[in-house]
Amino acid sequence: MEIVTQTFEKLLTSKTIDEVERILDDLKIDMKYRMDDKVYPRLKFKITKEEIEELKERGVITTDNLLADLSNADPLTKLLYSVSWKNGDLKKVKHIIEGIVSGQQDEKENGLVFYQFGKYLTKKPGEPIIDQHVLRAFGVYKANGDKEKIDRFKRLSLITKKEKELIDQYKLWLRTNLTKELRDNDNYSYHVDKVLFAVGKSINEKS
């Protein structure tokens, strides 16, 4: 698809965050496809393995990486816990924690989106935020014109262990294929993710 080809051509030659940020405007990607910074403001903090271990020592997190009983926690913690509970997201926190404390090599097969989000929260270079739209755009790019593969990736809506290889390929691409000048910027993968999120979302709606 031409829009995907143009997107990756621009990403591969970008040397600054500003150049990456201009791509969506240059390609005239509609605002409705773009990540809303008011809904998803940039996370400027990181969470380390050591911080998770400290929470375990304090009894906030169990040895199984689940949230413990927080009845005696501070009001903010209880409020955020309540939001996760109401949305049915308590088990998702386990996957995020596992992503934060894991090493580079792993065999994780479920909860991949939240697991990778945990890796992103460590703010280690080349650890992106993964979602269906980003992988859709990258998958179409990797299909290299193969219509059958393109059609399959355009329909991608749920990320399972079948997409683990594609996730690994995307992470390798982020760490090795982009210009060194771009990779020298802190949190560069976040800005690349935003571009691919919008492009992937646009080709899904148009498919």
Language model feature labels by segment:
Residues I97-K124:
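Helix-hairpin-helix
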Residues E50-E57, A68, N72-G88, Q116-L121, ...:
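Short, hydrophobic/amphipathic alpha-helical patches that form generic packing surfaces
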Residues M1-G103:
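Long, highly charged, low-complexity intrinsically disordered interaction regions
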Residues M1-F45, P128-S207:
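C-terminal accessory module of base-excision DNA glycosylases/AP lyases that mediates lesion recognition
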Residues N65-P75, D89, V113, G145, ...:
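Intrinsic-disorder/low-complexity, polar/charged segments
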